[in-house]
């Protein structure tokens, strides 16, 4: 059994027990999160697609930790003009574990 959920503007295919790195959520570590935006559910070799979401379907997950991703360096310059700008960015994420798929 698997489901496709939408969170943070992205879609993820999940199964029970999966560990995911998703866009940062405001929930505390150790708390549970329910995702109601389920795009598709597969159960007993039958796939149900939503329009846009499957009704009466949800996915429950546990928040494991929060963190920051690898540093990305953004460097802009204009040749022959002495214009240089260097900036770094680390994207925050939330690590979750899928506990249950309700369909």
UniProtKB/Swiss-Prot annotation:
InterPro entries found in the cross-reference section: bL21-like, bL21-like_sf, Ribosomal_bL21, Ribosomal_bL21_CS
Residues in coiled coil: none
The keyword rRNA-binding is annotated on this UniProt entry: yes
Pfam families assigned: Ribosomal_L21p
Signal peptide interval: none
Keyword terms, alphabetized: Ribonucleoprotein, Ribosomal protein, RNA-binding, rRNA-binding
Domain of life (superkingdom): Bacteria
Keyword NAD recorded: no
BP term (GO), one: translation
Family classification: Belongs to the bacterial ribosomal protein bL21 family.
Subunit and interaction comment: Part of the 50S ribosomal subunit. Contacts protein L20.
PANTHER family from the UniProt entry: 50S RIBOSOMAL PROTEIN L21, LARGE RIBOSOMAL SUBUNIT PROTEIN BL21M
HAMAP family: Ribosomal_bL21
Protein name: Large ribosomal subunit protein bL21
Source organism of the structure: Acetivibrio thermocellus (strain ATCC 27405 / DSM 1237 / JCM 9322 / NBRC 103400 / NCIMB 10682 / NRRL B-4536 / VPI 7372) (Clostridium thermocellum)
